[in-house]
Structure formats: C-alpha cells, structure tokens
Amino acid sequence: MPGIEIDVACLRRLGNLPGHAQLGDSVLAPHVESAVSEVLAILGARVPRNEAEEGRVRLAMGCFAMANALPVLNTFYLSQAEKVPRQVALTDYVFHDAGELLKLAAYWKNRGYEALREVGRTGGTVGVSVI
C-alpha cells in the first residue's frame, strides 16, 4: 500500500505536541516510521477502498505513533522538569505517572485499532472450521 504514510507534522497535530523548537523531529521520527510499518503489517493484503479509508489508515498510524512515543515524551518532560511550568502553558501535554502512561498508551493503540476495523473489508462472511 505505497503512498499511505504520515509525517512528524501529522503526529504533532494529532497529539497537540510542542513545536520543533521544544521537541525536535528526530525524537518523533522513529516512532512515526515504526507506526507506519506496524499499521501496514496489520493491514496485510487489505487495501483501503476509498479516500475515507485512507484517512482512517493515516489516523491509525498517528495513534500508534503516539502510543509508541509516549514513554519518550514523558522522559522529555521529566528531563526538562525545571522548565515544565512554563512549557505547560504552551502545550496540552503533561507529565504522567507510570499507571497513567500505560492507560494513555492503551487508549491510543485502541483508537488506532478502531480506525482500522473496517478498512478494506468487503462486508462478506468468514467461515471457520473447528477441528
């Protein structure tokens, strides 16, 4: 499914992340690349049938990238702790404890899976044999 991918700017918009000056593209790019590969592997032979489904694939890629980037983003805020009060005023992202981080990552993964649910489905039935 060549041609369907996202970039760091898409991830910044989706997650309302800080700009390049506060959070460099090099921090987010590996997570975007990983998410694109992960979503394409999940889809396998399924191909989006229209523009709306392509948008859902891109949304899933962004959601997976957010889930993958959360630990790094949390570390970014921890390492910048003395600057956090000023930065919190500039962004919606805040520091999370370990439990919150796991829940938030699961939320983003589930949102991504939900976006992929109907992509490339024909609406037919599937037969299963139990032996």
Label each PLM-derived region with a short phrase.
Residues L59-L70:
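Elongated alpha-helical scaffolds
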Residues P2, N68-I131:
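Short loop/turn elements at secondary-structure junctions
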Residues M1-R58, Y107-I131:
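Conserved short "hinge" loops at termini or chain/domain junctions
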